[in-house]
Amino acid sequence: MTASCWTICLFLLGSVTEFIVLASPEVNESQQQHPQNVYHDIGVTRNKIVTAQFECYQKIMKDNSQDRRGPVCNRTWDGWLCWDDTEAGITSEQHCPDYFQDFDPTEMVTKICTESGQWFLHPESNRTWTNFTRCNLHTTEGRRTAMNLFYLALIGHGLSLTSLFISLGIFFHFKSLSCQRITLHKNLFFSFVLNSIITIIWLTAVANNQELVQQNPISCKISQFIHLYIFGCNYFWMLCEGIYLHTLIVVAVFAEKQHLMWYYLLGWGFPLIPATIHAVARSYYYNDNCWISSNTSLLYIIHGPICAAMLVNLFFLLNIVRVLITKLKVTHQAKSSLYMKAVRATLILVPLLGIQYVLLPYKPSGRVSAEIYDYIMHILMHYQGLLVATIFCFFNGEVQAVLRRHWNQYRIQFGSTITQSDALRSASYTASSITEVQGCYSIDGHTEHLNGKNYHDFDNAIIKPENPFA
């Protein structure tokens, strides 16, 4: 595909995605015409509390209470949370509920069972009391952290877009870089460009718009579908890079030409399958909040194939390294050394892009440690485009050699142009001075000598310096 085709596709997809996300007039008009939508939050919270209360009373009735020994505080529902039987003198605790936006689920709620086997009574109200004060103790800090993470993501995708566009410009401009491996690089970069654009639109137009998320219109679900599809394309194009190198080095033994159609089907076509299955499943289960909620195992439909692709890719790359090391020991071929450099970049990149899935299940429960974890995960997730462009383009030896060669040519041309213009000015000044002298003294023979061959030789000697780098 030419650069103009890539540009047109990028413009159309970005415009369509932004239109899908932003063009939801039915939501805004319904909010203006129906004031009860303002209380949508209250309705959702009430439903959560009623559901939790129903489950608590079922649990209270089913649990066996015959094996109690000593004074025990009875199981109870305090209005928000369910508490099991607790021994006297013990402080029971559990995580804060997610009923309200300013509640931090990582913080803990406590309820004291006194030595007498009664739940603690608040001295002012003389009623049983549960300590929820820590749930919104760090609300301001949490909001500040959320905004920092939001801007960190935007900056990351902005830097990624800048570096990716520069890299694509280099690949398209310098025809000497054109080969099948660079074509795969272009598709990989283009998938990361689309991912950054759609993520920026998603963060600013959907995730940052709570009213839109609660209304759950079809437009934001479509944008989430596109987002997850492009997200999968990133990793399957990385798999294409690994398969290409494996076929080139291990299977086809340095054969340069391969059929790229299969790579296009794998990189752009296959991610449609898990994205479609996920969309159908979410439409039947967890069909809420624009499909943003992550408390569902349905996300394994997306993450499972991605993890499988990365494991297969890692296996291919390790096998390639094994083959290349063997070839280098036996033959010491320069070509094997060059391929080793190409493999090294991919081998470094695959773990860096996949480490987030290793860390994903291990989010710490503490507030500070969870905040550090969020910062690390945001850097790993939202700066991937910058990382890919840096390793595959800016650190690429071929790209550096081409840029260095063109820079030296530019310096030579620019330097020779300056030297030539200075020489022409000097020759013109010399010729005009001689002409003036000839006019004053009327020495015709000398004039003919200067305007003849000897003069042109002098001119050429001035224009063509011995040192071409001067």
From Swiss-Prot:
Pfam families: 7tm_2 (PF00002), HRM (PF02793). It is found in: Cell membrane. InterPro entries: GPCR_2, GPCR_2-like_7TM, GPCR_2_calcitonin_rcpt_fam, GPCR_2_CGRP1_rcpt, GPCR_2_extracell_dom_sf, GPCR_2_extracellular_dom, GPCR_2_secretin-like, GPCR_2_secretin-like_CS. Residues 1-23 form the signal peptide. Keywords: Cell membrane, Disulfide bond, G-protein coupled receptor, Glycoprotein, Membrane, Receptor, Signal, Transducer, Transmembrane, Transmembrane helix. Gene3D superfamilies: GPCR, family 2, extracellular hormone receptor domain, Rhodopsin 7-helix transmembrane proteins. Belongs to the G-protein coupled receptor 2 family. This is Calcitonin gene-related peptide type 1 receptor. It comes from Danio rerio (Zebrafish).
